[in-house]
Amino acid sequence: MLDAVIILLSIFTFAGVGFAVVDLLPDSVQMQISNMEALRWLAAGFMSIIGLAIGLVAQTTYRRLENQIRQTPIETILTRAVGLVIGLLIANLMLAPIFLLPIPGEFSFIKPTLAVFGSVVFAFLGISLADTHGRTFMRLINPNSIETMLLAEGTLKPIPPKVVDTSCIIDGRIEPLLATGFIEGQVLVPQFVLAELQQLADASNDQKRVRGRRGLDILGSIQADFPESIVIHSADYDDIATVDAKLVHLAQEINGILLTNDYNLSKVANLQKVQILNVNDLAQAVRPIYLPGDSLELKIIKQGKEASQGVGYLEDGTMVVVEEGRNYVGSELQVIVTSALQTSAGRMIFAKPPSVLAS
């Protein structure tokens, strides 16, 4: 609608100019024209064509300017406006003495020329300074403005909210992850997850009841320790049957990350293009890597498959097979890693006591 208004306004304006400009012709020329009315309409038609071309250019320029303004952060617009005002004020203050000087009549054009030129130059300098030092200026006013500006420019990405499922709460590892800062942003606990925890806590099955109460205790603990991070989300989807499907739908709806340690839920969510943060994958990624020659403090728990072997376990559950470790069952000793093997069941480390390596 606005595009049509710009074009029509330009056409009618130029047509009116063409219609009226005929009357500005010298009287001697008008006396030679037999049909002034026809000339007026001819001039109006010619000028309307020019008006159409200028209107199209104005409409295109307006749209480009509008898109640029929409994409420009409000902080940038504000700093440029301040720079423009300051530049114009300085221009007027500096040019005021010149306006007071007596200037001969034949040079009277100098004053308006200097006023226009000085205003344009100082306005441009003010905007340039605002672009260069605007962020520093905005930080003095609002310390959080720089982050807002970078987010608007796309330089920084906002932290998406995390949607936590029941298994992740019961697991309990979410608490140290929050404490160490590995999980940033808001953590949403949907109302239907809270209801599922309550159902488990009220279950007749002892194992389910223990899991449900553990989940509620952990949730209460992290809510008390991190009140700004934990948010109970009231969303519920009565038309969706399962809790897993509701979790995926909520994560899609708010463009969030699904926080879980459920393998099947992770696969289903990935198929639906939902970003996943699997706690088990994170634990696997941060497990220490032992290279041949590294030293371990290990307690030998049992004998291995071969007669001379002893077996122990690291804190993360990794099995360590110690050659010549049978005689150390039940005791702790220092062992040296000789090799590591990744199997479908997990990682296995082979080691030997220093005395065996020395011999």
Swiss-Prot record:
<feature type="domain" description="TRAM">
    <location>
        <begin position="289"/>
        <end position="350"/>
    </location>
</feature>
<feature type="binding site">
    <location>
        <position position="244"/>
    </location>
    <ligand>
        <name>Mg(2+)</name>
    </ligand>
</feature>
<comment type="function">
    <text>An RNase.</text>
</comment>
<dbReference type="Pfam" id="PF01850">
    <property type="entry name" value="PIN"/>
</dbReference>
<protein>
    <recommendedName>
        <fullName>Uncharacterized PIN and TRAM-domain containing protein slr1972</fullName>
        <ecNumber>3.1.-.-</ecNumber>
    </recommendedName>
</protein>
<dbReference type="GO" id="GO:0046872">
    <property type="term" value="F:metal ion binding"/>
</dbReference>
<feature type="binding site">
    <location>
        <position position="165"/>
    </location>
    <ligand>
        <name>Mg(2+)</name>
    </ligand>
</feature>
<keyword id="KW-0378">Hydrolase</keyword>
<dbReference type="GO" id="GO:0004518">
    <property type="term" value="F:nuclease activity"/>
</dbReference>
<dbReference type="InterPro" id="IPR029060">
    <property type="entry name" value="PIN-like_dom_sf"/>
</dbReference>
<keyword id="KW-0540">Nuclease</keyword>
<dbReference type="InterPro" id="IPR002792">
    <property type="entry name" value="TRAM_dom"/>
</dbReference>
<dbReference type="InterPro" id="IPR002716">
    <property type="entry name" value="PIN_dom"/>
</dbReference>
<comment type="similarity">
    <text>Belongs to the ycf81 family.</text>
</comment>
<keyword id="KW-0460">Magnesium</keyword>
<keyword id="KW-0479">Metal-binding</keyword>
<feature type="domain" description="PINc">
    <location>
        <begin position="163"/>
        <end position="275"/>
    </location>
</feature>
<dbReference type="InterPro" id="IPR052041">
    <property type="entry name" value="Nucleic_acid_metab_PIN/TRAM"/>
</dbReference>
<comment type="similarity">
    <text>In the central section; belongs to the PINc/VapC protein family.</text>
</comment>
